[in-house]
Amino acid sequence: MQIAIIAAGCFWGVQEVYLRKFIPAAAILKTSVGYTGGITADPTYKEVCTNTTNHAEALKIEFDEKLTSYDKIIEFFFAMHDPTTSNQQGNDIGTQYRSAIFTTNPEQATIAKRVMNEVQAKHYPNKKIVTQILPAGKWWDAEDYHQLYLEKNPDGYRCSSHFLRWNVFE
């Protein structure tokens, strides 16, 4: 089992896209939404939304490395959101919506940088990817009502930028 931590806008949609579109689905063992990358301890959603904590809305993915790779998790990340917008995904604006990869070890950082460079060359030759690649810091799970939010609220808000831009699994 390995952990990936990513931020790509509203965490509800990021979680939903990974759970519904990632192949093989069995590779995703567990997901949780939460906050990381900020300066305050144990932040609340309300605090994060003030743009004063510097936390990102993020997704923690526990995955089976026998069924998929960190490379594939990261390529999927770049395919499912717009990594060229700073602190914004669709209509969601603020530092909590930034594009970021929070790496748990040096190997993940190397892979994330390599995949980002490959995606930049292949899919965004005329736009600069602004995704931050940072060492993972403290993680705080978001409040319970945020966990699997769109599964519990099928008509809930979905960010317009959360869709697959290319087939990662060809």
Swiss-Prot record:
Catalytic activity: L-methionyl-[protein] + [thioredoxin]-disulfide + H2O = L-methionyl-(S)-S-oxide-[protein] + [thioredoxin]-dithiol; [thioredoxin]-disulfide + L-methionine + H2O = L-methionine (S)-S-oxide + [thioredoxin]-dithiol
Keywords: Cytoplasm, Nucleus, Oxidoreductase
GO annotation, cellular component aspect: cytoplasm; cytosol; nucleus
Gene Ontology terms: biological process: cellular response to oxidative stress; L-methionine salvage from methionine sulphoxide; protein repair
Keyword Nucleus: yes
Pfam families: PMSR
Cross-referenced InterPro entries: Met_Sox_Rdtase_MsrA_dom (IPR002569), Met_Sox_Rdtase_MsrA_sf (IPR036509)
NCBIfam families for this protein: msrA
Function: Has an important function as a repair enzyme for proteins that have been inactivated by oxidation. Catalyzes the reversible oxidation-reduction of methionine sulfoxide in proteins to methionine.
Family (UniProt): Belongs to the MsrA Met sulfoxide reductase family.
Protein known as: Probable peptide methionine sulfoxide reductase
